[in-house]
Amino acid sequence: MSNNMDKQSYIDEAEKELLHTYNRFSLVLDYGEGVHLYDTDGNAYLDFAAGIAVCALGYSNEHHKEALKAQVDKLLHTSNLYYNAPVIEAADKVLNASKMDRIFFTNSGTEAIEGAIKAAKKYAFTRDGHAGHEIIAMNHSFHGRSIGALSVTGNAHYQEPFEPLMPGVKFADFNDLESVKAQVTDKTCAIIMETIQGEGGIYPAKKEFIEGVRALCDEKDILLILDEIQCGMGRSGEMFAWQNYDVKPDIMTCAKALGCGVPVGAFLMTQRVADKSLAPGDHGTTYGGNPFVGAAVSAVFDEFKRLDIVSHVKEVAPYLEKKLDELVAKFDCLTARRGMGLMQGVECSLPVGKVSAEALNQGLIVITAGSNVLRFVPPLVIEKSDVDEMIEKLETTLVILSKSL
């Protein structure tokens, strides 16, 4: 296949060869710089999706690139039969930021969820055998598409074609403490939730809810698993979203911005859980935690520190919220804004898929969450001027669609 094909030729080739698991936009992206992406026709797009909350540092960050190039020249992979320095350095940085005690690196977010589930089940087995195996998850949640992660994803649309799934999962309503309490039995080993529900429509946990769940877990010796795959890594205005509350998880997961484009995830736990859960032979990975991803994670944390990303999010996020609120007040098709930090959602009565498509015509990348929410998860390095540009492009989009639909 030639590297000089036109856009339609690339698309035609993809439609013949790639498994049709995505309804893609008719766009072939070529390169990125800062907070902009460029397609093969040379068109520029202001990116307010960041590869679905992945590219926190934007595109072509020099420190990140140089760290990856240096590691490619040195050592890509060894296996976990041996130690390697880059992943040990990365582990230290993640643990220091999270105040957790132990970490296992995976290749993705869904693998991190699988590991977290296994750790919780092994902890319960060590404590009382197979008696305590049930997990409480949240309605409208999303944790991934592998079987274990899908089993704790509270959306029948994703689950039904793959049933029967993992047994022993119950669902409660997010931000409803009494609903969670009603599902607890002496068989409950863990409660899993996103600190901010993402795919479900951008719903941050209410303070009284998440702190109430933490207290419930303490009372019943239940493990609290917090999924920080999308909302973690500075996006909320703290390094991890749970740090906005008076809670600490027993197990947490992260991925996406952890490698800023390099495939890597992780699940972390307290020493108490580590002492009674996964031991040699219980879990493993071929690629997870190799030197290349270790260098990537380490470079990301170095850049977060150098650029003071968390403080920057705290500065820019209120401006984004203000401008989105003004937009909601201006357009009847927009009904509500909610979110935390640079993870925001706006309810829209127009077909949100069509809004995303028309936004591309205006040079803006914005994605959806749920059936009626526009999701804003830009690179964390955006400036207020980028927010202004986004609002201008989105206004144009909404005006066009309001007239045509």
Where do the protein language model's features map onto the residues?
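Conserved N-terminal phosphate-binding loop of PLP-dependent enzymes in the Aspartate aminotransferase
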Residues: 2-405
